[in-house]
Amino acid sequence: MKLSRKAKRYDDSVLPGEFQGFEVFHRVDAELEGTLEGFLRRSQDGVQLGEVVLERHAPKKLSFAKLKNKAEALSEQVNYLKERLEIVDHDRRGMYIQLRSLPPYKDDTQIQFNEISIGKNKIVVKRIAFYRKEEVKQQVPLQLSERELERLLFDIRQAIA
């Protein structure tokens, strides 16, 4: 997925999260001709999702207008996370759109938000925290119920289909 210069600079400044104890998953989706992979940890409180990547291996013809429509539809569909999603960045030539929580979660020490990056053949879902004191951005787990996880996987699959 080709990122805009702004998004690339931003992504380069996000530190990887500490996801020890998370299980890696990898599924082949024959119908979609793609793969679903990521890492998560299940507990009594639900699921902590480190990251999920859905990639379609058979390229699909897609205009930027259609990609934007899919991103807008996804932002409306994914209404079960703690914050609503809005388009914050896009790149017409690179066929890339970034959704983010607006407004994000804030407290005295940090700001956290969900981020979904949508490309022509790839979708990445993750949660990022900005720690004010250290001025550091780091990937953190996204807390979901099992039902929310299944719905999220269904919704991103529909967006890339």
Predicted segments — roles?
Residues 10, 17, 71, 103-106, ...:
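Residue-level detector of solvent-exposed, low-hydrophobicity positions
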